[in-house]
Amino acid sequence: RIIGKSGEPLIRKGVDMAMRLMGEQFVTGETIAEALANARKLEEKGFRYSYDMLGEAALTAADAQAYMVSYQQAIHAIGKASNGRGIYEGPGISIKLSALHPRYSRAQYDRVMEELYPRLKSLTLLARQYDIGINIDAEESDRLEISLDLLEKLCFEPELAGWNGIGFVIQAYQKRCPLVIDYLIDLATRSRRRLMIRLVKGAYWDSEIKRAQMDGLEGYPVYTRKVYTDVSYLACAKKLLAVPNLIYPQFATHNAHTLAAIYQLAGQNYYPGQYEFQCLHGMGEPLYEQVTGKVADGKLNRPCRIYAPVGTHETLLAYLVRRLLE
């Protein structure tokens, strides 16, 4: 027992050190200013960034307000750093809707529309002021419909008319993904804009499976084998590339085969603003250093945007677990 007690501080220190090392690998900076400074090295090589303020769902109104302030400060900082580069060439921000309201669920639909939507609109107008892209992050499947309703309302705001910086994230492991793309294409047509759509494979697989089992559902909302998700991803990529006037595709993948397939699907007549690849900070840079850059330097001359989490090591755990599962 004495040996056990004396070992506790050592174990604690070891865990803390491990978390810090992992944090340095996966987090761009503890503050947005630090993250912007750390990003310059890869920006000089042609990479772009989309920043995300780390943290999970808000549990109280105070949490939601703190996240709101954090996002506002980040947009101001990113906007100044962008210096007029625009939504395609400059940095952007990703926001999580569950961080903006403690009751973000279908059961609280009216409250969400009344209380969360004004916050989303306010952040989007601020992003427009600086002309930086703002992406609404994907979450669990039971929040998909409400997030699409919020997006639709946003797309028809008169103050945002004609601006193409609104973005939305879709997950290829969701069985509904191709149908969601059809809806987004229709929404872009009706609202007369070009939407930025980030296609990811999906990071909530374990919780989606467990939730479906606990609820006694007949089937799962997500594919149960990775190979199905890989095929779905390419099918969805093809749909996104087919409507370049309505969709700006952002292909987030660390899979070299998927990357090569999209490179071929998109054709060789690339033009700036056609599409971009994306990767997570600390995970995809070695692959994309072969992609981003001039053909004369042996690269593919295709843009890559790095998804860059910002936050302290205390806020890292949930994000880190998802990355380790990947």
Predicted regions and their residues:
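Positively charged, amphipathic and often flexible ligand-engagement surfaces
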Residues: R1-E326
